[in-house]
Amino acid sequence: MDRIIIEGGNTQLKGEVVIEGAKNAVLPLLAAAILPTEGQTLLKNVPILSDVFTMNNVVRGLNVAVDFDEERNQILVDATGDILDVAPYEYVSQMRASIVVLGPILARNGHAKVSMPGGCTIGSRPIDLHLKGLEAMGAKIQQTGGDITATADRLKGANIYMDFPSVGATQNLMMAATLADGTTIIENAAREPEIVDLANLLNKMGARVIGAGTETLTIIGVDKMHGTDHSVVQDRIEAGTFMVAAAMTNGNVLVKNAVWEHNRPLISKLREMGVQVTEEERGIRVISDVTKLRPVTVKTMPHPGFPTDMQAQFTALMAVVKGESTMIETVFENRFQHLEEMRRMGLTSEILRDTAMIHGGEQLQGAQVMSTDLRASAALILTGMVADGKTTVGKLNHLDRGYYQFHEKLTKLGATISRVNGE
């Protein structure tokens, strides 16, 4: 398996970096492309990531034509023929987000069978909210041997209150409701930008989704949907990762195409820490002097709170800021695994249930470390840039799921990073 080697200690990032389309947006968009029975769906600004290839294969396995033009970052989907109702286990088992095909398949075919999904090992991440919502819409759910089978002649509009604003459940139920008989209201819905992006695509397809980005979603069912063109929203987590990278390396970086509104919680905490963050016509500029930064307390929350997908990267920033910072993780359990690896680099930290205390400001040392999940892999690479000596990061399969040419982009900004093949 590939490794990334970082020569750290004096890294100072300067220049411009271009942000890709959002991984967390394009995966449900591909699931939504199952719904139209007329016309083709063209997705633009698609990131070239292993998760995208996996989702393409999930959709192809349903007898849907999927053509990925990597040079143009476009995917053309044609689901106008009869589609299968069993999602391919070979690919579903690789990725958590693949569960979002359950709602679209069920809505279109009246029957769906999907295996329990795989992906990052971050907590239990139960899918009960998905299933409860579908049951409220009239689906009969069976779980046997790791498979989920859902049946409904036609889903019925329903009032659904979600116990937690789950992004995946909101996406699944929103897509299922587009072809339901009647009106569905989802309360305590997720409000992430990726939810808004999905709603925009569905509405272009002929759906009637109202209230995306608020706590209450209203979906008025339609009889059929059609293909359309849609450009994937920019990746706020990739943007945030490079903003943090600039902050922890005394950098001056323009993060091109980054959307200010989508990154507001992160920007607020960076400014509280003392980082200079400004909005420019082409993106967001980050300028930092680490010696002047202050420790902060951060609590992850569903959007519009601080994103859990930026938690690991922000703890890397906390590690270089003198004093004690606190990170409280409220969204997922078991998401501090990267701190164990960072301790190998000299970080002093304590973890008590959902809270990590980071004692920052001590010079870190390069070490051999292993990625534990997608965002942890980015955090370890960022930490390697500020640690003295050589850091080797393994298990890059996690990194490739969510970042395109990550080490190349950092190299162009001034980091000394290489990727090598083999064990």
UniProtKB/Swiss-Prot annotation:
Its main location: cytoplasm. Signal peptide: none annotated. Pfam families: EPSP_synthase (PF00275). The keyword Transferase applies. Its EC number is 2.5.1.7. It comes from the Bacteria. UDP-N-acetyl-alpha-D-glucosamine binds at R96, R125, P126, I127, D128, L129, D309, V331. It is an enzyme of class 2 (transferase). The modification 2-(S-cysteinyl)pyruvic acid O-phosphothioketal is found at C120. GO terms for biological process: cell division; cell wall organization; peptidoglycan biosynthetic process; regulation of cell shape; UDP-N-acetylgalactosamine biosynthetic process. The keyword Cell wall biogenesis/degradation applies. InterPro entries: Enolpyruvate_Tfrase_dom, Enolpyruvate_Tfrase_sf, MurA_subfamily, RNA3'P_cycl/enolpyr_Trfase_a/b, UDP_GlcNAc_COvinyl_MurA. Keywords: Cell cycle, Cell division, Cell shape, Cell wall biogenesis/degradation, Cytoplasm, Peptidoglycan synthesis, Pyruvate, Transferase. It catalyses: phosphoenolpyruvate + UDP-N-acetyl-alpha-D-glucosamine = UDP-N-acetyl-3-O-(1-carboxyvinyl)-alpha-D-glucosamine + phosphate. PANTHER family: UDP-N-ACETYLGLUCOSAMINE 1-CARBOXYVINYLTRANSFERASE (PTHR43783:SF1). This is UDP-N-acetylglucosamine 1-carboxyvinyltransferase 1. The lineage of its organism: Bacteria, Bacillati, Bacillota, Bacilli, Lactobacillales. The gene is murA1.
